[in-house]
């Protein structure tokens, strides 16, 4: 009886510790369902039905492994990826990495900020510029939570992630997809045209986020409680749950677009405004409203995450710190410029996701090198299978990007 109580008590303690360590992956996961995903997934689903769902499945599995490696680096070394690059690489390489990481972070924030502004425009009937102002105010308010520590921010962003997931369950019910075709699209690879390759690269860029690779290692580098192995075990659960939710949202997003638009003849829907307006007569006003609300939630939470990632990148690479409100103000400017110039916001969203896909390999290569170094990682060093899988992911990403560049240059 005594042994049972001891085991029960230790089991409760282990569960309590796992719960206490939950959260960092939810902040990372929100980057995987930002408005860039909305734009790319809607275009892919409307244009090609269920044919590109397999890209989402494999990209999400890759993302799970990548985020586990990023989190593991922080746990094992007490330093984030940017700091490790700074400590191990020559200064010119470090400065190159910092510049490209800042560009990637700003491209990400552009997509997220404009996406939230579009969401406000759709559900409130305001102008895009007014939506951008509302987005700026809302993100400043959310960032103020950082003053109270990481946990309050994790709870708010985790709540927004769950809201977006719930919203897309509702959208799935409204759209009534063909489950047999949906399942086929998830498991059978298909890239029927050069446009499909372009969108596949965009889906990859929208699903595997370079800036979140840097951020996640910083969120776990100061975790406390239990042994390193226990913290790593809890982190794997954290990543598995958060990334499964994010992957589900991306799948449902593309499947909903396929069911609602592609199979009703609206294959040219490539604009978030058009998607919202088309949903109203096809499904219902409620479905369109849920779409708008989920876009706002995804945009607000992911633009906050983008701001945090930019801060980590700057501090890690060049040891320079600026207040979060200053960074938020500066990174809002490109979004306002795009809006004031009257550029197509949805096209900007998709292009930003393609740009992101070029930053994945640059973040992945050092991540794999560091996490495969037994001197750095100790007992958390990568296994041979993980190393091999990681390099396969790098090769796939680079190959897809080369295919995209050649196809674009030749006008294929």
From Swiss-Prot:
| Cysteine pairs bridged by disulfides in the record | none
**Lineage of this protein's species?**
Bacteria, Pseudomonadati, Pseudomonadota, Gammaproteobacteria, Enterobacterales
GO MF, one term, reads: symporter activity
| Predominant place of localization | membrane
Q: Which residues lie on this side of the membrane: Periplasmic?
A: 40-51, 119-125, 176-196, 259-276, 345-350, 407-412
Functional description taken from the UniProt entry: H(+)-stimulated, divalent metal cation uptake system.
Give the record's GO biological process terms: iron ion transmembrane transport
One GO term describing the cellular component: plasma membrane
- List locations, semicolon-separated: Cell inner membrane
Instruction: Give the record's family classification.
Output: Belongs to the NRAMP family.
Name this protein carries in UniProt: Divalent metal cation transporter MntH
């Amino acid at each position: 009886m005594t042994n049972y109580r001891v085991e029960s008590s230790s089991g409760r303690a282990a569960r309590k510790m796992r719960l206490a360590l939950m959260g960092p992956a939810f902040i990372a996961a929100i980057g995987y369902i930002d408005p860039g995903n909305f734009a790319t997934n809607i275009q892919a689903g409307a244009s090609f039905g269920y044919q590109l769902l397999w890209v989402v499945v494999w990209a999400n599995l890759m993302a799970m492994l990548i985020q586990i490696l990023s989190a593991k680096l922080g746990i094992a070394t007490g330093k984030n990826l940017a700091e490790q690059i700074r400590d191990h690489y020559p200064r010119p390489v470090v400065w190159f990495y910092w510049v490209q990481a800042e560009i990637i972070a700003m491209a990400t924030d552009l997509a997220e900020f404009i996406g939230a502004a579009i969401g406000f425009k759709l559900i409130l009937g305001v102008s895009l510029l007014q939506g951008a102002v509302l987005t700026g105010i809302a993100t400043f308010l959310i960032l103020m939570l950082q003053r109270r520590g990481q946990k309050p921010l994790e709870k708010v962003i985790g709540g927004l992630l769950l809201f977006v997931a719930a919203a897309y369950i509702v959208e799935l019910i409204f759209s009534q997809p063909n489950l047999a075709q949906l399942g086929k699209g998830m498991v059978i690879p298909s890239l029927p045209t050069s446009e499909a390759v372009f969108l596949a690269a965009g889906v990859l860029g929208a699903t595997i986020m370079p800036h979140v690779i840097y951020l996640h290692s910083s969120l776990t580098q100061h975790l406390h409680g239990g042994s390193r192995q226990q913290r790593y075990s809890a982190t794997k659960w954290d990543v598995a749950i958060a990334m499964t939710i994010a992957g589900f949202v991306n799948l449902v997003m593309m499947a909903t677009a396929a069911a609602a638009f592609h199979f009703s003849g609206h294959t040219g829907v490539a604009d978030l405004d058009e998607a919202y307006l088309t949903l109203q007569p096809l499904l219902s006003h409620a479905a369109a409203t849920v779409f708008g609300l989920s876009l706002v939630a995804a945009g607000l939470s992911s633009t906050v995450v983008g701001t945090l990632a930019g801060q980590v990148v700057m501090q890690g690479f060049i040891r320079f710190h600026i207040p979060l409100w200053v960074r938020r103000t500066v990174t809002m400017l490109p979004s306002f410029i795009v809006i004031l110039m009257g550029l197509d916001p949805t096209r900007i969203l998709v292009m930003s996701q393609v740009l992101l896909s070029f930053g994945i390999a640059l973040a992945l290569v050092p991540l794999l090198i560091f996490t495969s170094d037994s001197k750095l990682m100790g007992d958390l060093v990568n296994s041979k299978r993980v190393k091999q899988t990681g390099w396969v992911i790098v090769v796939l990403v680079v190959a897809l990007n080369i295919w995209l560049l050649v196809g674009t240059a030749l006008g294929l």
